[in-house]
């Protein structure tokens, strides 16, 4: 297993906020190199890559709010492992302090160092669950007062941490509640004739548990439900799930967590409610039409079109648009962004029309030719509440160790189109 040699938290200006060395002293050159690399990318107004290379070591870095988390390593390390460690560090700090910004880190450096020391022991990941860490590391004084006012206990036995490391034993609520939110993230590519060329749906079961004690829950799905490429939270009883694929038995963490993630082929699911027609026309003209064929309104709809040359004019029937010039070339290319706050299912088709300027005869000429570039594709993004693309359905949620108690509050579904592309005719 790869080891974590050091952890650095720096702000957007490169100032060091926190430093933890888990395997002895690291060279001061490491921190200086991190600062120099980040400053170099900042001068170019570019976001640095996840991995920064040096002849003696690698630096893994990621920006969260206004704090950059950096982990250097001198040996071969799996990037996904480091990324998972980073996400868990961010989740823990957010759980304790409500955010991961520079001001919160500066005010709570001592507690964060204690948390990191418990999470990383001599370079190895040990206790990474926020609920378990709350039993080990004392909460800040403000949080202690808040928990006292709300009636939550701060002194708990360590037995629960040993048996169920992902759940704190001090969970106590006046009313027991359990919420489920299924997020379906769609990635798809459509051909010019409107037919699907490729598509996948990645679904996450986001849960929020507010149940006192140590509940044992049984989530029953619609009979015959099969979850493809599924990844469960460590609390799930896999033995029972293998015997009964439509039942999920688990002891939930306290608060928010992802119970399961699974992926399905979009071709076997329902079609998207938003239909897009994109056409190249004569003399540099192009047209985009959007229709809502579903029964619910689509929110925060956004169309992104890559424009390969100068843009003369744009007209839209609804919404706003903006043209963003490319940061990486001196040409007149860029991204045309069309935003619509809400597209009701009763609305007529929305239309965007535009005109491209003629191409230059050559790179050094100011004269225009009679030829035009053709647009290749556009990207669609939107959010649709209360709808689902597959037949996934929760039938019931029972508390096995307390059958008389009811905590289930229902399921909410959201479709998020984040990587959906339509090719122009």
From Swiss-Prot:
Membrane topology label: Peripheral membrane protein
Positions of the MHD domain: 175-423
Subcellular location: Cytoplasm, Cytoskeleton, Microtubule organizing center, Spindle pole body; Membrane; Golgi apparatus; Cytoplasmic vesicle membrane
InterPro entries per UniProt: Adaptor_comp_med_subunit, AP2_Mu_C_sf, Clathrin_mu, Longin-like_dom_sf, MHD
Superkingdom, natural source: Eukaryota
Principal location: cytoplasm
Described function: Part of the AP-3 complex, an adaptor-related complex which is not clathrin-associated. The complex is associated with the Golgi region as well as more peripheral structures. It facilitates the budding of vesicles from the Golgi membrane and may be directly involved in trafficking to the vacuole.
Family listed: Belongs to the adaptor complexes medium subunit family.
The protein's name: AP-3 complex subunit mu
Gene field: apm3
């Amino acid at each position: 297993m790869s080891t974590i040699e050091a952890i650095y938290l720096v702000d957007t200006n490169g100032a060091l906020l926190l430093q933890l060395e888990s395997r002895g002293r690291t060279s001061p050159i490491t921190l200086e190199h991190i600062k120099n690399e980040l400053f170099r990318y900042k001068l170019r107004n570019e976001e640095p890559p996840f991995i920064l290379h040096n002849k003696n070591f690698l630096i893994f870095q990621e920006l969260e709010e206004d704090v950059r988390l950096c982990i250097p390593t001198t040996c071969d390390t799996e990037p996904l492992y480091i990324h998972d460690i980073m996400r868990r560090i961010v989740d823990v700090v957010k759980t304790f302090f409500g955010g991961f910004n520079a001001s919160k880190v500066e005010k709570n450096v001592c507690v964060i160092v204690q948390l990191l020391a418990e999470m990383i022991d001599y370079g190895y990941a040990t206790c990474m669950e926020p609920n378990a860490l709350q039993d080990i590391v004392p909460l800040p004084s403000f949080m202690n007062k808040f928990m006292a006012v709300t009636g939550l206990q701060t002194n708990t036995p360590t037995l629960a941490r040993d048996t169920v490391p992902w759940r704190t034993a001090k969970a106590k609520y006046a009313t027991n509640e359990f919420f489920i939110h299924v997020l379906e993230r769609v990635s798809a590519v459509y051909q010019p004739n409107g037919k699907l060329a490729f598509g996948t749906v990645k679904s996450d079961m986001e849960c929020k548990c507010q149940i006192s004690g140590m509940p044992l829950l049984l989530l029953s799905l619609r009979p015959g439900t099969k979850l493809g490429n599924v990844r469960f939270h460590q609390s799930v009883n896999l033995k029972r799930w293998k015997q009964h694929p439509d039942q999920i038995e688990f002891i939930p963490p306290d608060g928010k967590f992802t119970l399961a993630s699974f992926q399905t082929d979009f071709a076997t699911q329902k079609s998207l409610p938003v239909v897009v027609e994109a056409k190249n026309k004569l003399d540099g003209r192009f047209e985009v039409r959007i229709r809502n064929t579903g029964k619910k309104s689509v929110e925060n709809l956004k169309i992104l079109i890559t424009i390969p040359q100068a843009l003369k004019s744009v007209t839209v029937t609804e919404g706003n648009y903006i043209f963003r010039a490319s940061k990486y070339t001196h040409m007149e290319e860029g991204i045309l962004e069309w935003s619509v706050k809400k597209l009701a299912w009763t609305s007529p088709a929305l239309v965007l029309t535009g005109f491209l300027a003629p191409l230059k005869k050559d790179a050094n000429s100011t004269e225009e030719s009679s030829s035009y570039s053709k647009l290749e594709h556009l990207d669609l993004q939107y959010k649709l509440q209360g709808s689902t693309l597959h037949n996934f359905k929760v039938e019931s949620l029972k508390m096995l160790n307390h059958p008389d108690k009811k905590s289930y509050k229902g399921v909410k579904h959201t479709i998020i189109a984040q990587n959906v592309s339509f090719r122009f005719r």
